[in-house]
Amino acid sequence: MTLVVYNTLTRRKEVFQPFGGSESISADEAAGGEKPLVRMYVCGVTVYDLCHLGHARTYVVWDMVRRYLECRGYRVKYVQNFTDVDDKILKRALERGESMQAVAERFIAEYFQDMDRLNIKRADLYPRATRSLRAMFELIQSLELKGFAYRVRDPLAPQGETPAYDVYYAVRKFPDYGQLSGRKLEELEAGASGRVGEEGAGKRDPFDFALWKAAPPSEPGFESPWGWGRPGWHIECSAMVRETLGDHIDIHAGGADLIFPHHENELAQSEPITGKPLAKYWLHNGFVNVNGQKMSKSLGNFTTLRQALALYHPMALRLFLLQTHYRSPIDLTEAAMEAASHGWETLQKGIHCAQQFGQGGSPDSEAMRAFQTAMDDDFGTPGALALAFELAKELIREHNLLTHQGHTHLQPHLLRQKGAALLEILATLGFCWPQPAQGSEKAAANGELAKLPPLEDARIEELVAQRTAARKAKNFAEADRIREQLKALGITLIDQKDGTTRWLRQ
């Protein structure tokens, strides 16, 4: 099977083949040598406030993509930045009478607290804009030398002092501008291309955007080849990509709101310098709407992730965010979240049944093929989760049969395989759940048998066979002893009418 992904740049699905790797990797190939490397960059948050549900969707989606690539045998170098210098951070700092650094540090800590609850794996690197200034200077100077950027003296700087300059990117110098977003210059709204103020009087073209903006000496900023100032938003990511992953990466990802202007400008800044495509695959996730309207503070429907986590289980929220294909918009409603909460309860019951049936053996091969088929089609989580629900419900039915009627339709080894498939699918999608206490832990809590190691499935089967032999020999004292030993270790035995015995982990 071959993994295909939708590339925003080409507007079509393409076979996924990173620069250093094959398009399909078998388990034997992955185990036998160096795994192909995928270089992946995700645009991170601007750290001036708590994360909202749009952020949650973005980082759950790319966490899922990373996990699935690793499942398929790739090594993923995952980099996600923090924008820790920005006019919004400056405004928040002035409001609170704090430094920009203090504001940034606090909200970086809040970010990790929220994302940890969603079970999002940490990135390999978290570069920060303030720590990548030298790389920004090098890029801007290279763009100046190649004629793609120009400087304009800041008219507000006092005469006689060291001059300060704004530096702008000359959009019309790059003939492919608009290739990512599909927009043409004549269709674009002037001034819509950056977050550092774009109204500079010296701009040669209304479409040009800031690479560096001069700042008054009284404002936070940095010394640069162009005097005191702050970087433009877009140059920050271009510099951090190059500094951490090189000139040419496999995946550049983010929310659909970043396609234009942010990613369009990143591409335009980077490619004239390197002569190479910045990224082979550009991937973007859809918006979060609230009751059919785009989520925004102005509409009063803005929900922070912290508020949502106060109402719903983190894994129910993760389920809600993955039940819709990542490129489609998702509508947050109370009914949708209640459905996700009930769905997570069903999956938890399935997980519990899988744990009780035992986890020995390999996952059901048919289920895993179906999972890979769904996910190989541009990370099709709706199909993958539908399969997980089928497995969970089947395990619940079989568990109810065994509990109430003493038998199951499926043989024990098949139940264990289906349980293993459910757990592997959910783990690959990034879900987490409490692990069952091992026998020695339960015994220790009871003050009994504390030194016994956790029992493997094979050892349980061995003890069950010994008990069966004792019962046949009418050695009921020994049979009872084995039953009590297993009970203390969290194993329940169910004697069936045909003389066999089934077991469940508590």
Swiss-Prot record:
Cofactor binding mode and count: Binds 1 zinc ion per subunit.
Its EC number(s): 6.1.1.16
Cofactor(s), by name: Zn(2+)
Keyword DNA-binding set for record: no
SMART domains: DALR_2
UniProt short sequence motif 'HIGH' region, positions renumbered to this chain: 45-55
Keyword list, A-Z: Aminoacyl-tRNA synthetase, ATP-binding, Cytoplasm, Ligase, Metal-binding, Nucleotide-binding, Protein biosynthesis, Zinc
Subcellular location: Cytoplasm
Keyword Zinc carried by entry: yes
CDD domains assigned: CysRS_core (cd00672)
InterPro entries to which the protein is assigned, alphabetical: Cys-tRNA-ligase, Cys-tRNA-synt_Ia_DALR, Cys-tRNA/MSH_ligase, CysS_C, Rossmann-like_a/b/a_fold, tRNA-synt_1_cat_dom, tRNAsynth_Ia_anticodon-bd
Reactions catalysed according to its record: tRNA(Cys) + L-cysteine + ATP = L-cysteinyl-tRNA(Cys) + AMP + diphosphate
GO function terms (MF aspect): ATP binding; cysteine-tRNA ligase activity; zinc ion binding
Residues annotated to bind Zn(2+): 43, 237, 262, 266
Motif ('KMSKS' region): 294-298
PANTHER family: CYSTEINE--TRNA LIGASE, CYTOPLASMIC, CYSTEINYL-TRNA SYNTHETASE
Membership in a protein family: Belongs to the class-I aminoacyl-tRNA synthetase family.
HAMAP family xrefs: Cys_tRNA_synth (MF_00041)
Quaternary state and interactors: Monomer.
Protein name in UniProt: Cysteine--tRNA ligase
Organism this protein belongs to: Synechococcus sp. (strain JA-3-3Ab)
